[in-house]
Amino acid sequence: MTRAQRSLKDIIRHFTPNWFTMNMGTGILFLSLHESYPSALPGQDVLTRGLWLFDMVLYLIFTALLLSRFVLFPDTLGRLLRHPVQSMFLGAIPMGLVPILDGWLLFGGQIFGHAAVVLAETLWWTDAFLAVLFGWLVPYFMFTQQEHLLERMTAVWLLPIVSAEVTAAAGGLLARHLPPGVAEVIVTTSYVLWALSVPLALTIVVILFLRLVLHKLPHRDMAVSSWLVLGPLGTGSLGLLLLGVAAPAAFAGTQLASLGSLAYGVGVIGGLMLWGYGLWWWVMAWVLTLRYMREGLPFNMGWWGFTFPLGVYAAATLQLAHETGFVAFGVFGALLVVQLAGFWTVVTARTFHGMWHGYLFNAPCLSNESGGLHPRGNA
């Protein structure tokens, strides 16, 4: 066996779900660019479509690598599930798929017509299944087999929980493209998915606040986790807004018809309140990050936490601008997208550097074995 073949085998064995956070960050970037600057920038349409295609290719590659790991090294699945940090990133698998299916709704119809909507609906149900599966599976292992201490807790606990509300937000967008009967099922299911995620995520945020007060900041390797709280708050807000927009048409002519206008109002008010909660965490995340930067931030795949949570918060801000007509939301949302693009550019460059040199392919759940490509890598 050649050196290159051994290297590929090592990469497969040490491939982790963390890599799907790259899909999350890239996906929310093209969605945010499409929403905040619709055809306003030279080459904007080509850029967003290009990022969508790039995101799909990455997702297919990452899926093939992860499945290859579990087929070739089946013992690593159990070790992953028992790892108190790596297992959390299983939630990134369905979350990374959501922007891709949204892209089929935004761009695919111009090429494939109604078939693009059918594919997006199929992907949505697949995504919903995975989100619910990991939303129960990972906490089960947390309760029964993983070892956790309050002082070691970080916001990564949110990852397997938040995926269901990300799917719910996508359901609000998908429902607009479907006939009323199907749209009603999608919207109703999405509200259930939202409820499976947001209340539990808010509970975790409360525990996280207590942990930070009692035990102060986590190690700088987990510094970026302070941005993750924006995820459930931004997506929770966005989900209420999008479902509120979709509900009147989806419920028309059904027993729930009278709830359509109510759902819209709840979406705006509830979305605004969650957005305000997120504003507190956005400021705090900046303050904590600047403090960490004085110590130096070591790069790892956790840096993708700079992107998706910020992106969904930006998307919620832009949706609030659309629903309320307040110019301030539009301006702030556009600035958040600029921040997102800057973060994405830096993190992508560092990621490709780590991929080329191999040090990012290092599974912590296998850290007691020899054969890791580099001591650095995944957080």
Regions found by a protein language model. Give the residues of each.
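Generic multipass alpha-helical transmembrane bundles of integral membrane proteins
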Residues: 122, 126, 157, 161-285
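A generic, well-ordered mixed alpha/beta core segment in the N-terminal half of proteins
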Residues: 102-142
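Extended, compositionally biased non-globular segments
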Residues: 259-324
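Extracellular/periplasmic helix-loop-helix junctions in multi-pass membrane proteins
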Residues: 39-42, 177-187, 247-261, 292-296, ...
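Central hydrophobic cores of alpha-helical transmembrane segments in multi-pass inner-membrane proteins
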Residues: 53-71, 129-139
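Juxtamembrane helix-loop boundaries in multi-pass membrane proteins
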Residues: 3-35, 48, 52, 74-102, ...
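Small-residue-rich transmembrane alpha-helices that serve as helix-helix interface/gating elements
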Residues: 274-275, 330-346
